[in-house]
Each structure stands twice: as structure tokens, then as C-alpha cells.
Amino acid sequence: MKELSVDHLLGIKYINENDINLIFETADHFKEVINRPIKKVPSLRDITIANIFFENSTRTKLSFELAQKRLSADVISFSAAQSSVKKGETLIDTVNNILSMKVDMVVMRHSNPGAAYFLSKNVKASIVNAGDGAHEHPTQALLDSYSIREKLGDVAGKKVVIVGDILHSRVALSNIYALQMQGAEVKVCGPKTLIPRYIESLGVTVEPNLRKALEWCDVANMLRVQNERMDVNFFPSTREYAQQYGVDKPLLDSLNKEIVIMHPGPINRGVEITSEVADSDHSVILNQVENGVAIRMAVIYLLASKIQ
């Protein structure tokens, strides 16, 4: 059986293209499984997984839990509000207490960049990064690339523009790593205040004009503005942002070409994209959600195989 080159999924920059291909091949199998009348397989009946979320999450947490249960793993979940970390306990002590209950794998979301990496060096369990601050969100990038592959046949050679709040987005960074690793060309588009200064050092081109970016691309991945990570105003108003960087149907129609619209969610309808665009044939947003379960099943299964 083929194996991943890593014992943890901490970020896209820690894996290679062979790992991505193996995850996609495994996800192809699980995509077929989750579309059967009986959507469960007994693959991980002897594995216990803890989902530890120190930041709020709806889609990602539900997707991980469903993926784990589809694999027949035992699952425990808790949020920071219920955690002893609130009482002063360290992250390592919290996780080691959980591991002492014979937990095999930890899926963690944390506000601090590098938290998952830090944990992997200090505890004896397989760690999956479900998002660490504005650093990485590897399973989101994997499901995004998988969705492009599903829609367009391949990721290699495709032109992808990531639009919006690049500065505060863990999705953007993981996507850049994953897309480039698979041979795609990447540009970013957004207000200058929301583009990191280092971005061009990653081999990414900045295109400040949305129309030009859309005329160039095959795929547009629309990111929301992450107001919860901002302590100052990065643009004059939401209305002005939507006028400059929002995608609506008249804009898409005027391009005279087919492009794929993606969004990691949650969508701010009328800001990044209008409802007409979100619900159109251009959009693969709900496909991304479905593919997220298959991708997370694949990641968990492959990492658990190394434990066993």
C-alpha cells in the first residue's frame, strides 16, 4: 500500500506532489463511498480521534466529524469555551490529558500560526491542522484543488486567481502552495492593503484590477473579508469593496468566457459574490463542500494507516 511521506498534515508546504496525488486517488474512492445508499465503511473502527477547536467553526468541524464517522472512527469533540485552557492550562497539557484516554489522532484549529507544528513536536499522536491563525488550512487547499481537477480535468496548466482578503487568509497561503506544486499559475487580486508584502516572493503575481484578473483566469477563488482578524479599517466601506472586488452576473457575462467560481465559505452574499453567481452554473461551491468530506476521509485514513 502507498503511504504518505508525513506522519501529520500540518500544512501543504510539508507535503509533496506525490502525497497530493495519493490523497486525491484515495478521495476518489471515498467520493464513491459517500454516494452509496450505505455511506459508512469500517476502516477505522479501532481509531479514536479528538477534534479540538480553539476557534469557531461550522463547516470544517462538521466536515471532519462526518468524515471520521463515515470511516467508523470513535470521535470526541470540544471547543475552547469548554476547555481547561480557559482556566490557564497549557495547550500541551490539555492535549496530553486527552491522549491519556487512548486517543490516536488530533484534529486541531487554533488562532496561533504554527500551533499544529508545535503540537506535533511535543505530543505522541498524529496531528491534522484544521487551520492555524492566518497561516495554513491544508485540507481546504486540497479540497479546492480536488474540485478544480474534478471540474477541469487537471490542475496543471490552469490559471487561478485568488480574490479578496489575502493578508488574513490561511486559505490563500495553502492554496498558493498546493496549486503551484501541481503546476498551476497563480495570481492574487484585492485591495493593496489586503495583499501581504511578501506575496510576490512566493512566485505569485499581483493583479489589482478584478476585470483583468477574471479575463486571465480559468478559476476564481473568492475569499471573504475577515473582519474578525482586523483591528483597523483596511478599506473605506463594504459597499466600496463590493463595487471594486465583488463578482456579479453582469461582470461574468461581459467576459465572454467560462470561468469556475469557488469560495471556501462562509459567503457574504452581495460582497464577494452575488447570489446569482453563487447559485449559478459557474459555481462549484457546494461541490467543494461535498469534496471536503471525501478529502478529509482520505487524509484521516492515510494518516491512520501509518499509526496502525
Swiss-Prot record:
Which residues, by range, are in coiled-coil regions? Answer: none
Q: Looking at the keywords, is Transferase present?
A: yes
Q: Which reaction does it catalyse?
A: carbamoyl phosphate + L-aspartate = N-carbamoyl-L-aspartate + phosphate + H(+)
Matching entries from InterPro entries are given as: Asp/Orn_carbamoyltranf_P-bd, Asp/Orn_carbamoylTrfase, Asp/Orn_carbamoylTrfase_sf, Asp_carbamoyltransf, Asp_carbamoyltransf_Asp/Orn-bd
- Pathway assignment: Pyrimidine metabolism; UMP biosynthesis via de novo pathway; (S)-dihydroorotate from bicarbonate: step 2/3
Q: What class of enzyme is it?
A: transferase
- EC annotation from Swiss-Prot or TrEMBL: 2.1.3.2
Q: Which Pfam families match?
A: OTCace (PF00185), OTCace_N (PF02729)
UniProt keyword list: Pyrimidine biosynthesis, Transferase
Q: Where does L-aspartate bind?
A: 87, 170, 224
GO aspect biological process, one term: amino acid metabolic process
An MF annotation (GO) of this entry = aspartate carbamoyltransferase activity
- Domain of life assignment: Bacteria
Residues annotated as binding carbamoyl phosphate are: 59-60, 109, 137, 140, 265-266
Look up keyword Kinase and say if it applies.
no
Q: How does it assemble?
A: Heterododecamer (2C3:3R2) of six catalytic PyrB chains organized as two trimers (C3), and six regulatory PyrI chains organized as three dimers (R2).
HAMAP family linked to this entry: Asp_carb_tr (MF_00001)
Q: Which family does it belong to?
A: Belongs to the aspartate/ornithine carbamoyltransferase superfamily. ATCase family.
What the entry lists under PANTHER family is as follows: ASPARTATE CARBAMOYLTRANSFERASE (PTHR45753:SF6), ORNITHINE CARBAMOYLTRANSFERASE, MITOCHONDRIAL (PTHR45753)
* Protein's job: Catalyzes the condensation of carbamoyl phosphate and aspartate to form carbamoyl aspartate and inorganic phosphate, the committed step in the de novo pyrimidine nucleotide biosynthesis pathway.
Q: Write down what this protein is called.
A: Aspartate carbamoyltransferase catalytic subunit
